[in-house]
Amino acid sequence: MQCEFFIQKRCTSCHLCAQPYSEQVTNKDQQLRELIAPATDVQWLPPVTSADTAFRNKAKMVVLGAAHAPILGIEDAQGQPLSLVTCPLYPQPMQELLAYLENWIRIAGIPPYNKLKKKGELKFILLTRSENSGQFMLRFVARSHAVLERIERNLPTLIAAFPMIEVISVNIQPVHMARLEGEEEIFLTETQSLLEHFNDVPMVIRPKSFFQTNPKVAEQLYATARTWVREIAPTQMWDLFCGVGGFALHCAAPDTAVTGIEIEPEAIASAQRSAQMMGIDNLSFAALDSAKFSQSQMSAPELVLVNPPRRGLGSELTAQLEALAPKYILYSSCNPQTMVKDIAELSSYQMIRVQWFDMFPHTDHAEVLTLLVRK
């Protein structure tokens, strides 16, 4: 991938982008094999690769500069503002809207927040695009309600220029610290969620719910999990750390009941709405801590799917899964290092199948799907 920001050494987030993409995949595959299954008899399936540009559906932009010259991007290594509105990770429609927003913020006279002076208002622009419809969800993260009047006054111009913006909200984050968002979300549009489709499965995206940032690869991840689950054909399964329900919505079937557990209520609201749209009766969701949920259960279904955050399952949950003894565990991980640690603690289980998905090109990160069976 040719990236002027990387060449200039002003942005190094994609630290592998100077390597040919095929070489990145080969190296990553070798590294993952050495980490996950160096000496085990495991079925290692070919990786699912990504486009190397224009694959990302979400942008998190720091608002820098001044009201008369706002910049959406990051601070470079020298602490200088760097506009990333033309970042090659974003599809052209996202680049166009981000570039427009820089000028729109200037015209609206909205002062960027200055973390050194602790002055100003606008902290972040969070932009999500539906791969399926091309519609956008735009969130302004601001220090206070003072920004609302200027945003609302200039909103008609923005919507007229980009009618594909479906959801607009202002998130109030008043504290002076490196926190992306606050508790209060103020919607400026009647619509409060974005609709995405993966493999004909509707996925409702609300402002605070986690959603995969590489939709093409995520679609294949969910489809693969569904295939593996249908081979097992459990009558019941759990989806722990289910988020907006991507795995649960794909795996539920007339003869497979799924319970999805996620601590974030907004993500559960999205998952429940998606299930209603699909008309699935044997799919339920609850806003609970996954470890506390499993601790309250006397037994486990035949299959438990887990998709934890980067920190992994942790010793408490791995111990509970050991005790509950489901026959199969399907582990999807964005951090193979913590996954390997968790699997080592699941000593009653044997790894039988692995496939990785290049959700994060030009980095060392990968999404790994692993099937474990009880010995």
From Swiss-Prot:
Binding site for [4Fe-4S] cluster: C3, C11, C14, C87
GO molecular function: 4 iron, 4 sulfur cluster binding; iron ion binding; rRNA (uridine-C5-)-methyltransferase activity
Binding site for S-adenosyl-L-methionine: Q212, F241, E262, N307
Annotated coiled-coil segments of the chain: none
Alphabetic keyword roster: 4Fe-4S, Iron, Iron-sulfur, Metal-binding, Methyltransferase, rRNA processing, S-adenosyl-L-methionine, Transferase
Cross-referenced Gene3D superfamilies: 2.40.50.1070, Vaccinia Virus protein VP39
Listed CDD domains: AdoMet_MTases
GO annotation terms (biological process): rRNA base methylation
Enzyme class per UniProt: transferase
Role: Catalyzes the formation of 5-methyl-uridine at position 747 (m5U747) in 23S rRNA.
Protein name in UniProt: 23S rRNA (uracil(747)-C(5))-methyltransferase RlmC
Organism whose genome encodes this protein: Vibrio cholerae serotype O1 (strain ATCC 39315 / El Tor Inaba N16961)
Gene label: rlmC
